[in-house]
Design a protein with these regions (language model features):
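Membrane-embedded alpha-helical bundles that constitute the cytochrome b-like, heme-associated redox core
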Residues: 1-284
């Protein structure tokens, strides 16, 4: 069955739009490789790029559940597996390019993974996502049974944690994107925890969703400031003030707040019209 068909074999516009989005980063990477635009260390840049896109798509897959509920887009479930498999394939390429960069010397590769803790963490996450990728098909769902399959795929949460930690550690001082990615991941986990702790038949009110985004964004600002204090002994208050000086660029916390504003706006737009309009009661 073609990738742009749904499970019933019908053409799916959503899948047809998603497929080129998933392939676009790889096409761009090939183009920049052929035009020698990957910088002074093209192999290293390629390794980092495919790994980063793998992590981005992993988080995009985790976004499907909240957007289905908050945005009332039930059809999004149709592309969750596609996004997850794409994340796994980018991670496969991530390791292949690393092996190529080590001149195909598997002894060196094993030694590096064993001796460098950030590579050990990354490889552990890689093994996990390979298991999830290999079982992301209807055959494995039938073989394992629905309950066992779902329990297995809950491993995506610790895998994502390891992936974010690996990204932080290999980034060293360039932690801008790892910080906002971590902030968004924290919100995704908080959202799931809320639904687990307070099961509801319907979605949480939008003011609750917006409040959680605000809190996680504030936490992102604070943790970034704490990181600067630990690394450079920069006063936390001064770092927090600098977050509101856009001449130095937009800091990670703003990305988290921006994502929260977008999710909340989508949720508001998708509300039934009667829920959006103020309700007036006649005077008694």
């Amino acid at each position: 069955m073609a990738l742009w068909h749904d499970k019933r074999g019908r053409f799916s516009l959503l899948r047809a739009v998603t497929l080129p989005i998933l392939v676009a980063p790889l096409i761009a990477l090939i183009y920049f490789t052929l035009t020698h635009d990957l910088g002074a260390r093209p192999r290293t840049e390629a390794i980092h790029e495919v790994g980063l896109w793998g992590l981005r798509f992993l988080l995009a897959g985790l976004f499907i559940t909240p957007m289905r509920k908050i945005g009332r887009y039930a059809l999004l479930i149709d592309i969750r597996r596609m996004i997850g498999v794409a994340a796994a394939l980018y991670m496969v390429l991530h390791l292949i390019l690393y092996i190529v960069d080590q001149a195909y010397d598997l002894g060196v590769v094993v030694s590096e993974i064993t001796l460098r803790i950030y590579l050990t963490i990354g490889f552990t996450a890689w093994l996990g996502i390979m298991v999830l990728g290999a079982t992301s098909n209807d055959y494995m769902v039938r073989e394992l049974g629905g309950m066992r399959w779902r329990n297995l795929h809950r491993l995506v949460y610790p895998i994502a944690v390891l992936g974010v930690i690996h990204y932080f550690m290999q980034s060293k001082l360039e932690v801008f994107e790892p910080t906002w990615i971590a902030g968004i991941f924290v919100w995704l986990m908080l959202y799931r925890y809320m639904h687990w702790q307070f099961p509801r038949g319907d979605e949480f009110p939008l003011w609750v969703i917006a409040s959680t985004w605000f809190a996680v964004g504030a936490l992102t600002f604070l943790l970034e400031a704490l990181g600067f204090y630990i690394a450079f002994h920069a006063p936390i208050g001064r770092v927090l003030l600098a977050d509101f000086n856009f001449q130095a660029g937009v800091r990670p916390g703003w990305y988290v707040w921006g994502a929260g504003a977008l999710v909340t706006l989508i949720g508001w737009i998708r509300l039934p019209r009667a829920s959006r309009e103020p309700q007036f009661r006649p005077a008694q």
